[in-house]
Amino acid sequence: MRILTVIILLLIVVPGCNEDNRPQIPYVYVNVTLYPNTMDYINTMGYKYVNAGYRGIVVFRISQDLFMVYERCCPYDPEKTGAKITVDPSNVTCVDSVCMSKFILTDGTPFGGPSPYSLMQYHWTYDGDALYIYN
């Protein structure tokens, strides 16, 4: 009887141990094509805002063939009205307009402010001409 009680308690307690309490950014379908070498020109170590996603997208070009694509909604409190990341003048970091969390654009990790969460990334492929962004 004692073993049965322990097993039942473990079945109740253990599944709750791995619960992810990270706030969820609402899902919005994304399928965008950019031409970073022509009309949508993006310099190396430069960026472009795109009107897509939940609160917008920022495309950061690390090198000729390497991009990082992030949701502009802050992962700390996605439901906060007006919360949107903007790239700072250094073009290396960005900051949320409400909670003031700061993120590194090369990998999306937080380095200041209250957010312990990285920026949400979108998938992308680049064929040398077109940059396809999707989720």
For the regions a protein language model found, what residue spans apply to each?
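Positively charged n-region of N-terminal signal peptides that target proteins for export
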Residues: 1-4
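Alpha-helical transmembrane segments
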Residues: 7-11
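C-terminal motif of bacterial Sec signal peptides marking the signal peptidase cleavage site
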Residues: 12-16
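N-terminal pre-ligand scaffold of iron-sulfur
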Residues: 18-89, 104-105, 120-135
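Short cysteine-rich clusters marking metal-coordination/redox-active sites
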Residues: 74, 94-96
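Short metal-binding segments enriched for Cys and/or His
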Residues: 102-111
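Polybasic, low-complexity RNA-engagement segments
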Residues: 114
